[in-house]
Design a protein with these regions (language model features):
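Short coil turns that delineate tetratricopeptide repeat
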Residues: 11, 45, 66-67, 100, ...
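Register position in tetratricopeptide repeats
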Residues: 26, 55, 81, 115, ...
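TPR-repeat structural position
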Residues: 30, 58-59, 85, 119, ...
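Alpha-helical adaptor scaffolds
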Residues: 70-145
């Protein structure tokens, strides 16, 4: 349990939790959020320290490859869904640094943008991802989804086929290819 803890059969509020830090972020109390993250020994909290520093505009603790992979999408989605637009802009402003650590960063951002229906932004980040890692099958799959949503069946077909050239047994792409074929002869 995160917000609460058991002590002698009593349930008490746990003030130093990951959730407490995220509530502090929502309340624009970045100093408290950082202090809470620093008091917790976990990969999520380590990422949280980096996130707060990104939100403050001064990154001292660089996140690891795996921290970016595991938490960037979740937290960007959290900030978008809670209308923390200034914080979203801060995260997006740090993408060049983050992509230097994890080359898949732009793909992660593209997925968050797509799922939040920011389709044009999603496409822009997919293009950046493509320029860095063309042979990423998931990136091609995401392009195919984007173009299918845009009813551009020719490009959707192209990208799903590119995905399957790289990873022939990728089940989601096989299923997407079937869906695209309803609209476009492959």
């Amino acid at each position: 349990m995160f917000f609460f803890q058991h002590q002698n059969n009593d349930l008490t509020f746990k003030s130093r939790s990951i959730e407490h830090a995220y509530i502090a972020i929502l309340n624009n109390d970045l100093a408290s959020a950082e202090a809470v993250f620093k008091s917790i020994d976990s990969p999520r909290a380590n990422w949280g320290v980096s996130l707060v520093q990104i939100l403050n505009g001064f990154l001292e603790r660089f996140p690891t490859y795996f921290e970016i992979r595991n938490f960037l999408e979740i937290d960007l989605d959290f900030l978008i869904k809670n209308d923390k637009i200034d914080y979203v802009e801060s995260v997006l402003g740090a993408l060049k640094i983050l992509s230097g650590i994890n080359q898949e960063t732009y793909k992660y951002i593209a997925r968050v943008m797509y799922e939040n229906r920011f389709y044009n932004a999603s496409r822009e980040y997919l293009e950046k991802s493509k320029s860095i890692m063309y042979h990423d099958p998931e990136m091609h799959f995401m392009f195919a989804k984007y173009y299918l949503n845009d009813r551009d069946y020719q490009n959707a077909s192209h990208y799903v086929n590119e995905c399957l050239k790289i990873l022939p047994d990728y089940y989601p792409a096989k299923q997407l290819k079937k869906e695209i074929s309803k609209y476009w002869s492959l």
